Amino acid sequence: MKEKLKELQELAIKQIENSIKSNELEEIRVKFLGKKGELTTILRGMGGLSPEERPLVGKLVNEAKAKVEEKLESAIKKIKDKEKAEKLAGETIDISLPGKKQVIGKSHPLELTLKNMEDIFVSMGFTIEEGPEVEYDHYNFEALNIPKNHPARSEQDTLYINDNIVLRTQTSPVQVRTMENQKPPIKMISPGKVYRSDSVDATHSPIFYQMEGLVIDKGVTFADLKGTLELFAKKMFGDKVETKFRPHHFPFTEPSAEMDATCFVCGGEGCRVCKNSGWIELLGCGMVHPNVLRNCGIDPEVYSGFAFGFGVDRMVMLKYGIDDIRLLYESDMRFLNQF
């Protein structure tokens, strides 16, 4: 029995030493140490031995198993280390290879236009002011001379949080807050998002961008308003652009007007974009209503001022010839990569 155990032990160790793959070692383990393995079978057959032989044979079998297991574990570790090293060698990075080209982002046409407009007004001495998009009724309507029964207050046009709080429908509340917190002279613009209860179509969106401007000082006239906006139009669209002012009505300015510019597409000749009129509406403007000045603690007998407002999305569409406002908000890279 002792000789047989020695032969099995030597055979197992020899096969282990000759193995070069993990699956080969697993086969050896099953062959000698598994439930039906040769060394395990000897242990199970000890019932047929005499009481005197059992302790000796049991000791010899366990010693043989221990040596085979030790050799097996060592071989398994060695093969795994080798396989790992080979895998790592195959995955080595060639640092001489060129790297992947990074995709460079681009500015959105809305951002480009806003930045362009801001730069023009800042160069003219305007400051940029900001305010909350969730606004009190007082700042959005009351302080701007928009009475309780005004159509702009209806739920068809305005998104209400509650009776006293709305999503601002214009950036004019920033002008009110600025007049409350700063003493004249004031020369500011207020770009930002505004909200209306509109259905989405080619020319309407419930969220869009506005830029409004305000100038308050002693002796400010409508001529100052015209000169400021005409200069802006030339800087924005080129020296050849012409402008004209039409009478209009806004509750927060008096007198009020709308400014048109010669069509950027046809140069005033008439086309589909300008509906063959040669002119495109750019903005609303006017002299600040005395009631608005009083509401903000400014004496209209001493100070006067003018205000104006652009739809920035509209400016983008006019400047780049875009005929659907939805393109500005759909994040379609085929569209955005054109800018």
From Swiss-Prot:
GO terms for biological process: phenylalanyl-tRNA aminoacylation. CDD domains: PheRS_alpha_core. It comes from the Bacteria. The keyword Protein biosynthesis applies. InterPro entries: aa-tRNA-synth_II, aa-tRNA-synth_II/BPL/LPL, Phe-tRNA-synth_IIc_asu, Phe-tRNA_ligase_II_N, Phe_tRNA_ligase_alpha1_bac, Phenylalanyl-tRNA_Synthase, tRNA-bd_arm. This is Phenylalanine--tRNA ligase alpha subunit. It is an enzyme of class 6 (ligase). It comes from Clostridium botulinum (strain Eklund 17B / Type B). One of its GO terms (cellular component) is cytoplasm. Its main location: cytoplasm. Mg(2+) binds at E254. It is found in: Cytoplasm. Keywords: Aminoacyl-tRNA synthetase, ATP-binding, Cytoplasm, Ligase, Magnesium, Metal-binding, Nucleotide-binding, Protein biosynthesis. Its cofactor is Mg(2+). GO terms for molecular function: ATP binding; catalytic activity, acting on a protein; magnesium ion binding; phenylalanine-tRNA ligase activity; transferase activity; tRNA binding. Belongs to the class-II aminoacyl-tRNA synthetase family. Phe-tRNA synthetase alpha subunit type 1 subfamily. Tetramer of two alpha and two beta subunits.
